[in-house]
Each structure stands twice: as C-alpha cells, then as structure tokens.
Amino acid sequence: MSMHRVARAVASSEACAGALRGSVSRTRFLCLNAPVQRFGARNALLGAGLGAKRHFFQSPIIRSGVAQAVLEKAAADPSALTQEAIVDNLNAAERDRLRRVRNIGIAAHIDSGKTTATERVLFYTGRINAIHEVRGKDAVGAKMDSMELEREKGITIQSAATFCDWMKVENGKEEKYHINLIDTPGHIDFTIEVERALRVLDGAVMILCAVSGVQSQTITVDRQMRRYNVPRISFINKMDRMGANPFKAVEQINQKLRIPAAALQVPIGSEDSFNGVVDLIRMKAIYNDGPKGEIIRETDEIPEELKQLCKEKRALLIETLADVDDEIAEIFLDEKTPSIEQMKAAIRRATINLKFTPVLMGSALADKSVQPMLDAVCDYLPNPAEVENLALDKRRAEAPVKLVSYNELPFVGLAFKLEESNYGQLTYIRVYQGSLRKGMNVFNARTDKRVKIPRIVRMHSNEMEEVPEIGAGEICAVFGVDCASGDTFTDGGLPYSMSSMFVPDPVISLSIKPKTTKDGSNFSKAMNRFQREDPTFRVHVDAESQETIISGMGELHLDIYVERMRREYKVEVETGKPQVAYRETITEHVTFDHTLKKQTGGAGDYARVVGFLEPIEAGPNGYAPSTFKEEVTGGSISDKFLFACEKGFLASCEKGPLLGHPVLGTHMVVNDGATHMTDSSEMAFKNATQQAFRKAFKEGKPQVLEPLMKTTITAPNEFQGNIVGLLNKRNAIISDTEIGPEDFTLIADCSLNAMFGFSSQLRAATQGKGEFGMEFSHYAPAPGQLQKELISNYEKAQADRHKK
C-alpha cells in the first residue's frame, strides 16, 4: 500500500469514526505529536486505525512526511482514531496483556454488602487465606477495612485498593485475569471516596440488597457512574435474607435508574433455602460446595419447578438485548435464537457502551454465587484499551487528545488519592499511557515541577508490594511525590492535563481548637494532612472571630476527623456547635446610584457607580451562582475600573450583608458612573461597588436560604408512625414512601438545621433498628422566624465585636 493511499485514507477517517461519535465516551487523550522516530509502534497503530493495511505499519520506524501528516490529522481530530482501531491494532503482546486487565470498583448503598463481597473476591482469588466478617465475632474485621475506626463502626470510611488474579474457566480452559479492585464507602458523607475511585476506573460492580433493591445511595452512585461514563454490572446481594426479591430489584434498576437491565441468572431456592443460581445464557445450574463455597459445581439438571421461569427470563433477556444491540435485534426479528457466543458478545458491547447492565445474584455472606460475578467482570466489563480516555493539550487551546494504553508511548498518569503512611505521603496513580518506572523523572502538569519516583508499590488494603515498573492501564501507589489530589503527571514532553473529579461543596461547619496550646503543632499537622487527603474537608480561619472552622459533608464526616485527630495525633480538641452553610439572596429588582468621595488633604478617593441588582430566577436545580455584567456606554468608567467593580461584586458575594454567608441568585449590572482625573483608583471603584451592593441588597427584600437535605430513612414497619412524627416536628416534606415485607423506606426533604441530633432520636424511636442517610438537595428560603433570629444574632455578634 502506498503512502499516498494512506494520506487519502485520512480523508475518509471521519467515516471510520462515525460509529463511535454518537456514543457516550469517557472524556480524557493521546500523544500524537512526539518525534516519529521514537514511536514507530504508535505510527503502526494510527495508520491501521485510519484504514491502512496492518502489515505495512509493522516496521519499527516510519519517517515519511505523509505519515507525519496522518499523525497530525489524528491529533487535531481525536475521533479519527477509534477505540476499535486502538484495540485491533495494538501489538500482540500489548493486546494480550491489556485484554486480561480489569480496573473495577465496588459501590453501593450503605450496608448492601460491598466489603463482604470484596472479602469473598479476595478469598476466592487466593489473595487472602481466611475470611473475616465486617462485624465478625473474631473482632479481626474485613481485610479492606484496615482503619481501626472502620472495624469499630462496621462501615467503610476510606476507599481501599487491592489487586488479585482470577483464573476464569471457559470450555475447560483456564485463563488468568488481573483485577485492580477498589472497595468504596456507602455512606453519603464519604461520597468523595466514590467520586475519585470512579474517576479512574474502567468499570464497576454495583451491589444492591435483594430486599431493599434500589436505595437512596444507589441512586447517588448511579449518578456518579454516569458522570464518569463508567460501565457497570449489577450484583443483587443478600439473596438468603427474608423478603429477598431479586426481580423486583431488576425492575427498580429499569425504572428508578433508567438503564435497561435484565437478569442473567435465576435463583435456586429463596431466603433461607437459597442454594445457587441458574445461568440463563448457558442454561446450567451453578452450586457452591466446600466449607466456604470455594468449589463451583455446574450441572445441566435445572430444578423442574424452575424450568418454565428460566425459559421466560431467558426470553426476556434476549428481548432486552434486542432493544440495545443491533446484532441481536436482527436475530430477534428473524425469529431465530442467538447462540451463547452471540449473547455474551452483545451483553459486552451494550454494557461497555453504557446501554445495558447485566444483573447477577447471590449471597456474599452465605458464600454463594460470588465466582460467577467474577466471571462476569471478565466477560462484560472493559479492559483499559476499550475505554476512551482524553487529556487536554495545552498547546492546542486545551483541545482533547486521546490517550492510548500502550507501554511504548510517553507516560501520562493521574494522581487520584493521597494518603499518609508510616513512610510519608502515599500517592495513588492511574497510569493511562506509557509506563512508570522506579527512579523515573515525571513532571507535574499543574506546578510544572519535576519529581523523581523513588518507590512504586501495589496496594493490598494497608499492605504493599514493591514493584520496579507499572504498565499502561494499571493502578499503583508511589512514595515521595509532593502533589495534590487530581494532579496530572507526564514524562515532561507532553503538555497534557486531565480533568479532575467532581468535588461537592460542604454543607456543615463547626469551630474547633486544641484543648491545650502544646498540641498546636500536631493540630496544624492534622489539619494540613486531612485537607490534602480529602477535598471535601475544608479548613479556614474566620477573619472576625479568629476561630478555626472545619467544613464537611455531614456530622459523621466531621466526627470521624475529630476522632482521627485524637487517635492518630493524640490531640484532644474542643468543638463548637455545628454551623449550617446558609446562603443569602434578594427577591426584588432594586436600582443604585452610589458615590464614594473622600478628601483627606492629598489625593482623595472618588468613584461613582450606577446600576441595579435583580434576582436570578431559581431553576430546577435551585439557585444559580451570582453574576456580574457591565453595560457602560460612552466610556464613563474605563475598563480597568470596571474590572475593579467586578472584584468588588465578587468580594461582596463571598460575605453577604445579612449573615456574612455567600450570596446566591443575584445579578448585578453597572451601566453608568463617573471618575475623577486624579482621585479615582481601582481600590476606590472596588470599595464603591461593595458599598453600593450592600445598600441595594438590603433594599431588595433579602432572604436567608437554608440547605434542604434529601433524607432517606429505613426502619421496621412497626415504627412508621414514630418516624413520621419525628419528621413532622421538623417540618419535613415527605416525597416518597415504600413499604416492604419487613421494612419501609421513607424519603423526605428536611432542613439541615433541624436534623442535628436526629440520629439519637431515631435510635430511641426505633429501638436502635432504624437507619438514615442525608445528602444535599437544594437551597430554599428559611422560615421567617428563623431568618429573624439568625439576622438578629449576627447583628448582635457584630456589635459586640466592634465594642471590643
């Protein structure tokens, strides 16, 4: 094939990429402009992706200017290089290595059995020799809950990383898959741990309770998976519990999460008699034998009472696949039955393209049907080469560039989690492109500083295994790298950066100080460390009270850090009453014409600003951020002074006039003004704008906004009246109630201010059997009496400070 034909192939590259352009892809990029001589393998990959004959590009070095033009074209248009082309044209060794790698996370609602399932995965893959339960009698605790607090409370607080090898058996042959696994917390207060795990993973296992089905945090996790375009398989756990109803859970996935789903299995027995599953694809019964279910027994003998149900559920699976996969749709319309291979291939395609989630079922605690879930991870979740990852090329105005999971390309990685260890800061890195070697120099794209990698380790919960090198598509941890969570690292030759994770704003704050002054040093160390580790944990010093204020996602979130400070730094602290993150806004249009004029003998201050404030109408997602606009005509205020006006507006919005809280939903327009030849300055216009804002804001019928929390409460049915009574006292708005055979779930919007101390009252009202979770919903006007009290208290506190 001639080079001229390759060049012509570039012109048709749009067609080559058309199939993928309409699909959802994960946004992240590829080094296409490094020296051609150095990366001949890449040229082969690119050329084949653009329609060239594969054997032509097997040569190690291609120096042709036409080939370079092909590379430049692909760099300018990442869609020219499809994921199919990348997968098909990796060299044989790379393709084989990546084909057997899976980077997955386990995520779910609290108490759905994530950590218990992870413990079984580690046991069945040979990573641990014994199973320990989350709340086991031996008091050892699950392997992945390595923190003392996690084992005491029976919850996961930090995401924990590990790796294992799974020997998958297919048609009598064994094949080893390498799985990098992250177990995440289920509690909403630790949602950042789920965010940063999903940001760097290629797939996920979403665990649901067979009794409760889709719960509040399941919906949150689903939203996070969609944010990062993470394919998922679903595992319905706790099939041995009374009231287990897996097909109701499948229906809820379809209806509540709005993603097509179908069961790949039918349970053999139910509740206490749950004994195994029927594989609907191969129509085989699967049982677990051995003391811990470590032996898998398959048989063609399906229980007689299940044969009709299996036939119906298999037909439903094929019908659902026909809705999301063209190949199965054709077979279905021809009234033919797809083969096992066709069904598995369709499930894989639809899952990776985010069109479908296959549903499996089992009981981790009862050691049943966990191994088929591992097989499904290998069969249906993508390998690193099948996921489109993009970076931003700073040289090309942050245009997207594809990253390719190829060891021979220049290194690109993302630091997604920081952790303090006995050996210093531990930085978790996902390697997207190239390889990372011990002793290698890398560059931080944010700081532009060079860093040497002294040690590379693979993590197994709190244990580590040192390795000399880590390949593309893998996850590792490194020591001695000074960085922040979300930093991009490259080999120094690529001006790339990667988008970081979504970080929600804190909703609760409290003042904190060490009980004794001698603990001041350790107190500061703890604050600095916790901030580096957790982007949702914020610390600032109040300018007026000089108190240290910590902010976070909820009471439990802050309680955990206070307790960690005591245990890890031996610092006893005093905390103030929790403070709600209120906001301020106006409700009416109001004009202003304000002049700042000061004469003190020398050069004075002069600035006049004219304009108006108006409310921004609240949308479906609540109040919008405040905005500023200048509409000055005729040059009455110069550009540099208008910039100072905007700075004054932004400063005013940081600390509102009513309570000193940020301002939302307010639009300021400056449309006229005046300057003085000698007395006007940027500072004068900034101050004038702040004064005008404060005065106009108070005339615009201002309101205090309070955060409303979406609160989900689950408890036994007999306590429903007690809980409704508790919520009525708090003026909560109940939006949904779901009554199950044993428990009921209630969802309500509650004022955060009214929820302090709710956990102890809930325990008392339900004899300790109720549980609840909260996540921020939206801001709404606070009750009138509360607004008056808050404003009065703030004004009194301000007056007291001025007296001092």
Curated annotation (Swiss-Prot):
All copies of domain tr-type G, residue ranges: 99-385
Annotated metabolic or biological route of this protein: Protein biosynthesis; polypeptide chain elongation
Places the protein is found: Mitochondrion
A molecular function GO annotation: GTP binding
Pfam families: EFG_C (PF00679), EFG_III (PF14492), EFG_IV (PF03764), GTP_EFTU (PF00009), GTP_EFTU_D2 (PF03144)
Keywords annotated in UniProt: Elongation factor, GTP-binding, Mitochondrion, Nucleotide-binding, Protein biosynthesis, Transit peptide
Domain of life: Eukaryota
InterPro entries xref list: EFG_II, EFG_III, EFG_III/V, EFG_IV, EFG_V, EFG_V-like, EFTu-like_2, G_TR_CS
Signal sequence region: none
GO biological process: mitochondrial translational elongation
Transit peptide residue numbers: 1-63
GO cellular component, one term: mitochondrion
Sequence positions that bind GTP: 108-115, 183-187, 237-240
Family to which this protein belongs: Belongs to the TRAFAC class translation factor GTPase superfamily. Classic translation factor GTPase family. EF-G/EF-2 subfamily.
Function: Mitochondrial GTPase that catalyzes the GTP-dependent ribosomal translocation step during translation elongation. During this step, the ribosome changes from the pre-translocational (PRE) to the post-translocational (POST) state as the newly formed A-site-bound peptidyl-tRNA and P-site-bound deacylated tRNA move to the P and E sites, respectively. Catalyzes the coordinated movement of the two tRNA molecules, the mRNA and conformational changes in the ribosome.
Protein name: Elongation factor G, mitochondrial
